[in-house]
Amino acid sequence: MPAKDDTSSDKEKSLELFLKIGLDERTAKNTVANNKVTTNLTSVINDAGVTDGCSRTVGNLLYTVATKYPANALPHRPTLLQYIVNSKVKTTAQLDAALSFLSATGSENLDLNKFEEACGVGVEVSTEDIKHAVDEVVEENKATILELRYRVNVGELLGHVRKRLPWADAKVVKQLVDAKLYEILGDRTAADNEKPKKKKEKPAKVEDKAAPVATSEKPLEEDLNPYLIFPNPEDNFKVHTEVPFSDGNILRCCNTKALLEKHLKATGGKVLTRFPPEPNGYLHIGHAKAMFVDFGLAKDRNGGCYLRFDDTNPEAEKKEYIDHIEEIVQWMGWEPFKITYTSNYFQELYEFAVELIRRGHAYVDHQTADEIKEYREKKLNSPWRDRPISESLKLFEDMRRGFIEEGKATLRMKQDMQSDNYNMYDLIAYRIKFTPHPHAGDKWCIYPSYDYAHCIVDSIENVTHSLCTLEFETRRASYYWLLHALGIYQPYVWEYSRLNVSNTVMSKRKLNRLVTEKWVDGWDDPRLMTLAGLRRRGMTPTAINAFVRGMGITRSDGTLISVERLEYHVREELNKTAPRAMVVLHPLKVVITNLEAKSAIEVDAKKWPDAQADDASAFYKIPFSNVVYIERSDFRMQDSKDYYGLAPGKSVILRYAFPIKCTEVILADDNETILEIRAEYDPSKKTKPKGVLHWVSQPSPGVDPLKVEVRLFERLFLSENPAELDNWLGDLNPHSKVEISNAYGVSLLKDAKLGDRFQFERLGYFAVDQDSTPEKLVFNRTVTLKDSYGKGGK
């Protein structure tokens, strides 16, 4: 019998460990299949000290910690685990509250009193307390309960009880609510078990009014001002952060009265923010949130937002990316206060570095990258850390003048190598690179790091609010340490959660692979979540900004937002702005035998569902001729009760035109392939069939309708979170793009221009693509309709 490989053995050990903590077998096996969650859960179990097992209740809470713990608060995870194993945090509600509190706290010092208060530690809720709350909630909702009986939304009732008693045992709450309902209503009747009847709709109703999917209800944040949480510039005198040092000292960073007064005099008290992309790739939907935060706050407070290119790496910058970023920022509806480059400040940054050395806060180091990594892991000082200031000044000048080889020296900040925060491990301020800079030319051969430059430039530009995503929170200490060391103005820093959208990847490295390895058709491929891709797909900046606003500016990290929420906002926008038209993707010829070839009837089709009869601009003309085309999928040889398309001997309505009845089917020699349908129309319109089909027709005898190409897009990845997969490229959806080259459209479309958007009835919303030519238009499907006609043979 062959020996098991190490991987198989490790998985068996992990499975055994997970079963010990009470996970059910299915959950345990699914966890083992996910390397990231396996690593996290194993670490949590070890840190909690329960490798020999624990109760199922504790195990389930540990599993939640492993999958949902906020990355910005890792220093506090051991504390939470002890609260769990000691049964101080013992319910899901308590754990959710604890995770929320820790996410807001981040890497700052944890106030245990506030933590315990926030998650209900020590709060005991008796059964009598729960019974009293249930009685109150049921009484308040009694009229609804009596009307709907057992069809009442029990979840809402439970929610009302939870608001009164957030730490109550959920099982007990459910049992008491069920008992109270039985007390009032008695046994269920047959009527209670019937599904509520829905109002019957016409089968071919066009999507007149888009509604959100069940998972995408319009959140309250959209109706609030998301910028109310930010302080005014004149209030920027409080302690920004505390930086604990390994020797026991604590640095409390804040602006002096003189620094704040100087800043306010320079700005006139205006809010100034900055949007600082690195020009090394195309912006994606995550940047849309950053723009909404940075530009949005400035606009809300009548201030200004810099568009600042963080171009400290001369090898990564491309003019293509700079041009794209400027253009896409404008397309998103934002107007920069000024466009600046970090390289504009290279001279000032250099002078600040010299001053930092003079103050004893920086030194020239000769360690290699590997040595720096090793010393950081061991928390050891560099051998050159305590060299004389004069020596570092001379060597830094030699670095500037090009006298030292690339890789032989760096300038490092003298922070705290024994700190608990790895972002205080003597970060590099300057590196040598003998590479001309695209913006600054060949003046410099030393370039500042992001950690050194961005906070100083924030101060130079008098930025009032420096806003960034949560992964930068641990850098807050080094940010303020540097500004304090130089004695210059300190902006207010605040971190918010990244925007993570399902069924896509957004890391620049992964996006670059998709593009360079030709998995997609460039940075603006409509399947990508780049802003260029979303624009090409037909999405509007209004819809994208509404989506971002709906997410709110929160600190809850790690949440994966369903792409359906974005699609909801897109439908809401396009439903109001996209005129209707008809396109047949897979045409099936229908010959109207009781209409002469040259006797086409002109009919009015609506551009808008609420078009008024006296408004000619709300309609377009289409000919109803003796040759029309319907979707091939709207015809069947065998009719059925629940089918609303066309079949032999059956009638349907051609939208805006007449009822037609199939009288004959012409088959090919194989007796299977349908070549054409023959039908008669009812000029009196007395026939009232249920099915309504979209269609196009020959504009004149023997002349085909307008031929167009249509591209249908689906999710680029099959999994909700492909970024978590080891073989993420293997998760690509092979059917994410379907090209239909010979679709037919109504003549209304012939003058459509790049970017024009339409609702193709029963098919979805579409936009004109840049690949269109005078000979042939190309349309991209932006989103499907909320519902298709359903009964139209689709």
UniProtKB/Swiss-Prot annotation:
Keyword field = Aminoacyl-tRNA synthetase, ATP-binding, Ligase, Nucleotide-binding, Protein biosynthesis
For the ligand (ATP), the binding residues are: 278-280, 284-290, 469, 498-499, 506-508
Listed GO cellular component terms? cytosol
A GO biological process held by the record: reproductive structure development
This entry's Gene Ontology molecular function terms read:
ATP binding; glutamine-tRNA ligase activity
- The entry marks the following residues as binding L-glutamine, namely 310, 450
Q: Where is this motif: 'KMSKS' region?
A: 505-509
Instruction: Specify the domain of life of the species encoding this protein.
Output: Eukaryota
Keyword Transferase listed? The answer is no
PROSITE patterns, per this entry? AA_TRNA_LIGASE_I
Known EC number: 6.1.1.18
Instruction: List the CDD domains hit by this protein, alphabetically.
Output: GlnRS_core
Catalytic reactions on record: tRNA(Gln) + L-glutamine + ATP = L-glutaminyl-tRNA(Gln) + AMP + diphosphate
* Gene3D superfamilies the UniProt entry points to: 1.10.10.2420, Glutaminyl-tRNA synthetase, non-specific RNA binding region part 1, domain 1 (1.10.8.1290), HUPs (3.40.50.620), Ribosomal Protein L25, Chain P (2.40.240.10)
Q: What are the boundaries of the region Disordered?
A: 192-217
The listed location of motif 'HIGH' region is: 277-287
Record-linked PANTHER family: GLUTAMINE--TRNA LIGASE, GLUTAMINE-TRNA LIGASE
* Stated family: Belongs to the class-I aminoacyl-tRNA synthetase family.
Report what the protein is called. Glutamine--tRNA ligase
Q: Which organism is it from?
A: Lupinus luteus (European yellow lupine)
